[in-house]
Amino acid sequence: WIRLGPLSFQPSEIAKICYIFAGAATLERLFHKRNLTLFIVLTGVCIGLLGLMSDFGTAAIFFVTFLVIAYMRSGDFATLSLICGGAVFGAGIILKFKPYILSRFASWGHAWEAASTTGYQQTRTMSAAASGGLLGMGAGNGWLHNVAAADTDLVFGMLCEEWGLLIAVLAVGAIITLAFFAARACRVGRSSFYTIAACAASSLLVFQTCLNVFGSVDLLPLTGVTFPFVSNGGSAMMSAWGLLAYLKATDTRENASFAIARKHQRRLTQAARRRVEPIGDPFGTEKEERHEEN
């Protein structure tokens, strides 16, 4: 965290927006190995800095986002396989120098066996989620808020407890809907920059949601990432809305193109109507009728 007087923010959240912008801008033109090399270097620097800050959940999010952007421009599975192999090797080195990270994996899959130690948060989250049922206990009526990070890392359990499983599933479904929207935008997008940015942003949001939801119920190790648009925190909320702006920008460009087409079509229709509208008395019939009356 960086503190500026009474304000504090998490730089990794702001870096998500900048990273997608840099990746989409770097690979917007025709694919070149030089562009991919620069992007790989940028990704390595970002993940390395996140590792120094011990924010390995966000580092995993950056890596998955990198794979999405790189594949969209290259489509080369061989290169991506080598990158994944290097990432596994790097993760092994990190675990060697920071062995405390393994404690998060120690209780993975059997949190109830360590309910009072490393599995404390997950077991409390699962109990609270189960007590909420389908419709929940009501806003503010739960007890999970007494557990540390209940409104950030464990917010899915808090959502299930107070608002019910139905609302929690709808919240996850809303993030998945954004991914379907991004996939549709890829097929009709006019700009490769916005297409790459929209898909990368939606992939980031979906993967981050999976880490938060599955981590809180012990299906994945608890990584400490937030639930987009739901978790408490100004930095996380600003980051989520910033990522959503990429999808909106793609939609604006598409709608703008349709608006231009409709405007052009409207002009053609008006011009055609003017050509076919009858001119007042083109055959002089009124003059003949007046002559007969006289």
Regions found by a protein language model. Give the residues of each.
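Hydrophobic alpha-helical transmembrane segments
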Residues: K16, E161-A182
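Structural signal for the C-terminal ends of transmembrane alpha-helices
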Residues: G23-F31, L67-D76, I94-L95, I176-R187, ...
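Alpha-helical transmembrane segments of polytopic integral membrane proteins
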Residues: I20, A24, L50, K98, ...
